Amino acid sequence: MTIQIYAKTLTEKTITLDVETSDSIHNVKAKIQNKEGIPLDQQRLIFAGKQLEDGLTLADYNIQKESTLHLVLRLRGGMQIFVQTLTGKTITLEVKSSDTIDNVKAKIQDKEGILPRQQRLIFAGKQLEDGRTLADYNIQKESTLHLVLRLCGGMQIFVSTFSGKNFTSDTLTLKVESSDTIENVKAKIQDREGLRPDHQRLIFHGEELFTEDNRTLADYGIRNRSTLCLALRLRGDMYIFVKNLPYNSFTGENFILEVESSDTIDNVKAKLQDKERIPMDLHRLIFAGKPLEGGRTLAHYNIQKGSTLYLVTRFRCGMQIFVKTLTRKRINLEVESWDTIENVKAMVQDKEGIQPQPNLQRLIFLGKELKDGCTLADYSIQKESTLHLVLGMQIFVKLFGGKIITLEVLSSDTIKSVKAKIQDKVGSPPDQQILLFRGGQLQDGRTLGDYNIRNESTLHLFFHIRHGMQIFVKTFSFSGETPTCKTITLEVESSDTIDNVKVKIQHKVGIPLDRQRLIFGGRVLVGSRTLLDYNIQKGSTIHQLFLQRGGMQIFIKTLTGKTIILEVESSDTIANVKEKIQVKEGIKPDQQMLIFFGQQLEDGVTLGDYDIHKKSTLYLVLRLRQRRYDF
């Protein structure tokens, strides 16, 4: 059922919207964008003093007929965050949500002189990765990050062995860095004592140090002159006990299992299934009060010879939950409380077809992203709970030779992080990559969403050529009134802009910049683009047309229907045109967006570059200039 609601801006303007209560907040923002031209990412909607989340519906917030929402605009500018050091010092930074963690570290270096490679940034207990953005981690205005320093100089640590091992000394001294991984340290011990890493157990302050996840000495708080204890892993078999809890449906006697410390929990479950015919998916193992994860080893949990595990049977008791997409679609699923999030994603895939694939799905419950290895019960998800589905996407990158690579991304990924993914696949450093989409070059700090790059879009990848090349320009030189066709040779680089090329032409044959129009492959070349953008290579020929001087009339049409008549020249830049509009209408250039044939016009480009002729009509859209208010 359609209802009418209102969105009120801080300037007291009221926007009337026709909606359904099942519409998501994201859909409502899209309706506002269609009506007012305000981009989705600049909108904040407030109801009853609460900011509304994109993935939830109007009904979720009890928004009914003739309710009024308040629309607050997000400024494109930055925000302030805080970085706190371990000494208690707080650093204030001006950032944007699209800034990468690398950018933030560079800002810290500018303020404090700390090299980025010495910095580790922590937020909500999680270490932040360089290629990701602040938005990826939901870091908002006035959030606090924690800065931990990696010591770049070497340090000394001691490794003490238990009695019974005939080392050359009871204590080893190792030269290490705080950024060394546990795996590195074990390799150093192997170099000194010949003891294989998989035979070593390192202990610090009663905690075993594991090689999983590339943990470092700094991660475990190990500093200069700290002492680790080294114990040996016995490679022979050992016996452990598995005890049934009283309420299990499998009430047979307790079990003895022959295992190795390197066995995973899944291996142990498989042994139980072989021995007692207990299906693997119907039981969980507990040790020291903690559920054991399938991919971890017995050694990880410090399970040793004679240890006792407890077996808990998981009864089948199906329930129904709902998964809601951003397009308002609701998917009903029959699940068990011990189904993993990975299982749930597979069910979504089965119901919805090939897409969305599990690896492209993000499931959200109570504002928290759910991890694949955890169960519904771990998140207290019960009968008729609603999860929210946010989709990642696959995009394609086409290389110059025709090869296509596939990337898994989020629309919030920056172009810089996409280049890092490409480097992982093809080995090309990001600073040598140029990515194009719909003919435009993508800027590192912007996101895929900023460029409206969607699932299965194709980007084109070119590489910076580091050396010069020769191209030809077929041009006109003038003697009196008679034009003479002439071909000139230019020394250029693929990174040269079209404006640079025009300057070289002016130096060679004297044709003024504002009277040159360059064409390649039937396309007019835009001044700010590079030769590489147009795939102009060694030996290519560009055609130069001579622009005659002389005025012309064009029309500027506003969204209110008003038409403005301007006297211009084809050599006028878009910035010049905006100034003429300011003189006529008093509208500042930075509040103007000019559109021609659906394309936004760039300030530094000329009317001639866009093939705008006499009596052409441009459309004028005003940029809203709002203050930002925070509740």
From Swiss-Prot:
Alphabetical list of CDD domains matching this protein: Ubl_ubiquitin (cd01803)
Every Ubiquitin-like domain range: 3-78, 79-154, 155-237, 238-318, 319-392, 393-468, 469-551, 552-627
Residues cleaved off as propeptide: 628-631
Cross-link (Glycyl lysine isopeptide (Gly-Lys) (interchain with K-? in acceptor proteins)): 78, 154, 551
Top-level taxonomic group: Eukaryota
Pfam families, alphabetized: ubiquitin
GO CC, one annotated term: plant-type vacuole
Keyword line: Cytoplasm, Isopeptide bond, Nucleus, Repeat, Ubl conjugation pathway
The keyword Repeat is annotated on this UniProt entry: yes
SUPFAM superfamilies associated with the record: Ubiquitin-like (SSF54236)
Coarse class of the protein's main subcellular location: cytoplasm
Gene Ontology molecular function terms on file: mRNA binding
Localization in the cell: Cytoplasm; Nucleus
A Gene Ontology biological process term: ubiquitin-dependent protein catabolic process
UniProt record similarity statement: Belongs to the ubiquitin family.
Miscellaneous remark of the record: Ubiquitin is encoded by 16 different genes. Ubiquitin is generally synthesized as a polyubiquitin precursor with tandem head to tail repeats. Often, there is one to three additional amino acids after the last repeat, removed in the mature protein. Alternatively, ubiquitin extension protein is synthesized as a single copy of ubiquitin fused to a ribosomal protein (either eL40 or eS31) or to a ubiquitin-related protein (either RUB1 or RUB2). Following translation, extension protein is cleaved from ubiquitin.
Function: Ubiquitin exists either covalently attached to another protein, or free (unanchored). When covalently bound, it is conjugated to target proteins via an isopeptide bond either as a monomer (monoubiquitin), a polymer linked via different Lys residues of the ubiquitin (polyubiquitin chains) or a linear polymer linked via the initiator Met of the ubiquitin (linear polyubiquitin chains).
Protein name: Polyubiquitin 8
Taxonomic lineage of the native organism: Eukaryota, Viridiplantae, Streptophyta, Embryophyta, Tracheophyta
